[in-house]
Swiss-Prot record:
Keywords on record: Ribonucleoprotein, Ribosomal protein
Similarity comment text for this entry: Belongs to the bacterial ribosomal protein bL27 family.
Keyword Cytoplasm found: no
GO cellular component, one term: ribosome
Descriptive protein name: Large ribosomal subunit protein bL27
InterPro entries: Ribosomal_bL27 (IPR001684), Ribosomal_bL27_CS (IPR018261)
Gene Ontology MF terms in the entry: structural constituent of ribosome
Annotated region (Disordered), positions in chain: 1-24
Keyword Ribonucleoprotein: yes
Domain of life from the UniProt record: Bacteria
Length: 87
């Protein structure tokens, strides 16, 4: 005879991998067209000048330049500032 009753099965034992969201390029960092600046769910950070917005709300650079984060009317905005030509 078994001395222990059958144990119940747990319904919770699993976890999904992190989605690697967040800011990928910091303020003042150099970017080229196509570089991802922010990966996010929804528009926590809004696109400004010289940046594009992907269908999954990813913000990416459209031109070569430096990243600039700012807050306007309680909205975080990211821009890419063009670097002045040196020649």
């Amino acid at each position: 005879m078994a001395t222990k009753k059958a144990g119940g099965s747990s319904r919770n034992g699993r976890d999904s991998a992190g989605r690697r969201l967040g800011v990928k390029k910091a303020d003042g960092q150099y970017v080229i067209p196509g570089n991802i600046i922010v990966r996010q769910r929804g528009t926590k950070i809004h696109p400004g000048t010289n940046v594009g917005l992907g269908k999954d709300h990813t913000i990416f650079a459209l031109i070569e330049g430096r990243v600039e984060f700012l807050t306007k009317r309680n909205h975080k905005i990211v821009n890419v500032k063009e670097i002045a030509s040196t020649y």
